[in-house]
Amino acid sequence: MAKEKRILDLEKTIKKHQDLYYNAQPEISDAEFDALWDELKALDPQNKLFFTVPLESTEGFAKSEHIIPMGSQEKAADPPSFEAWALKMPFKEYIVQYKMDGASLELQYEEGHFVRAVTRGDGKIGDDITENVLKMKGLIKDITVNAGPAYGTKPFSGGIRCEVIMLRSIHQKYFKDKANCRNAANGLMKKKNGELCEHLNLFAYDAVQGSIGRPFTGDAPFKTESEKLVWLKKAGFNCVEVKYCKSIAEVIEYRAHVMDIRPSLDYDIDGLVIKNDTIDPEDMKRARPEKQIAFKFSLEEAVTVLKEIEWSESGATYTPIALIEPVRLAGTTVKRASLANPNIIKALNLKIGSRVVVTKRGEIIPKIEALAENPPNVKEIEYPDTCSVCGSPLTNEGTRLYCPNMSCPKLIHHRIEKWISVLDIRDFGITLIKRLFEMGRVNSITDLYTLTVEELAAIDRMGKLSAEKVYKALHSKKEISLTEFIAGFDIEGIGETMVEKLEEAGFNDLNELLGASEADFANVYQFGQVLSHTLVTNLSILKDEMTGLIDKGYIKIKPPLTSEEGAVLKGLSFCFTGELNTMKRAQAEALVKEKGGTVKSSVVKGLSYLVTNTPDSGSSKNKKAQELGTAIITEEAFLNLIGKV
């Protein structure tokens, strides 16, 4: 009886909050609503609420039918949930779009001419707000781009699905009295006279050819989802961001990236929409399509006060850390929050004394996501202006604050530590590196390879056996990948993931990298002007040491894998923990490298998979993987991944 009562209570509560949400008066956060939803799903997976669309309607507007029902989406709140869904799907590559946090709308066209705009409503029938939409930015009244000879030449007839968005900059300038951009957009789009609708923007994310009652009929100017998105842009629509991912791990990595840059966007997003490139009409007709999913940003948030900024030093970089009034988040007391870089401080207009929204999604240090308000007594944030070690003036590029002196002892010491870490030289600890650096014996990566067993043995508390072990560990990592080689030089912003993106773009050789220009790098995904300049500048400075390591025979860069079969794990990283059943751990690690992947000795941010035969254990690696959202798979799943089962 208790279970049935709880189900009824949840149904009632969810219906109430759905109505409030879709009519611009939410009383609880998205995270709180998702928790209710997930609890009901666990108790009653076939509950009718999962197969109906909540009502969104306003009196005073004419009603109109959708060309195709505007259903709800399956949801994944974390990487394991997304992976569980993805493994059930018949496709292994994904189209990933921003899930914009606004109000859904269908724009209807007849032979290229805009005829009406219909709100979500109950998913089948919504409010006709055509007059209001005519005042919004981003509306295309006449679609002049035709299908072309490959599909026929008739102008488009069908529905364009959009999100009505209020930009954050507009909200801050004109509508601060509204709780957030979504509430403001929902309120304005349903004003009877369309007043102030010029402050709203339309972003297109989907299209369906046909007419009311006859979806997917007639000529379509696209055959796949990717062609559809290209066509929408050609037609002139503002479109949501899109990324094409070739693996589950790449989707998870991209989600982490978007969560990091989310505060700097001028619009609100609350997740990603994942789908296949193949258009499936029958699936799209469902109230809850099975072959697409909303991969949500799992957050817990609270409002608190920014008390002070502490500047954390790592290598040459100075990173702002917010010291905040203690607040409870995810069962812990939070006193510090990450701000990533100076640009975030500027974008959010943060001051000492600001009331801020702090979120936690598993990281050790939570993040400041938004400004709640700036009270009258706030103070400007002060930035350090000189290096604490060498005294050089710091450079502030917005995305980073750093010491530009390439001879700064702190930078050199950090680079040597990074080299040892990236190459995973396990017996060469940071204490030994520090002692060698302080002795003046090691001042570059090259110096590491001139060390002798006798020199190492002479160091206090070392001894010959330990010295031989360290020497062997260092020289056993002679043949390494280009990714490891470049990432090991600790160039700001150029970690293993970014080097892999360079390789994917065709930079498979050290000489190609050394000879490339800023413009060449700027064409690579996620490489903007600043990062491209940083890379070219550092490669120029480090060129002699890089080529020297190779010319002297200390390091050999492995040639890139050429066949798709051989590089099946390219771009993926693995960490193994616990006992394996079919092979030794060293054999599994060798398999990963043979297939183009990389191996990590510990769970770190950006790791693709933790492989363990006890995924439910409370081990430190399992806990860390869960905190970082890293996919945890069994040995059997790993073997499936590399085609060994």
Curated annotation (Swiss-Prot):
Positions of NAD(+) binding: 30-34, 72-73, 120, 163, 275, 296
Catalytic activity: NAD(+) + (deoxyribonucleotide)n-3'-hydroxyl + 5'-phospho-(deoxyribonucleotide)m = (deoxyribonucleotide)n+m + AMP + beta-nicotinamide D-nucleotide
Ranges for domain BRCT: 564-645
A molecular function GO annotation: DNA ligase (NAD+) activity
Keyword Ligase: yes
Any matching Pfam family: BRCT
Transmembrane domains' residue ranges: none
Annotated residues for binding of Zn(2+): 387, 390, 403, 408
Physiological role: DNA ligase that catalyzes the formation of phosphodiester linkages between 5'-phosphoryl and 3'-hydroxyl groups in double-stranded DNA using NAD as a coenzyme and as the energy source for the reaction. It is essential for DNA replication and repair of damaged DNA.
Family: Belongs to the NAD-dependent DNA ligase family. LigA subfamily.
Protein name, entry field: DNA ligase
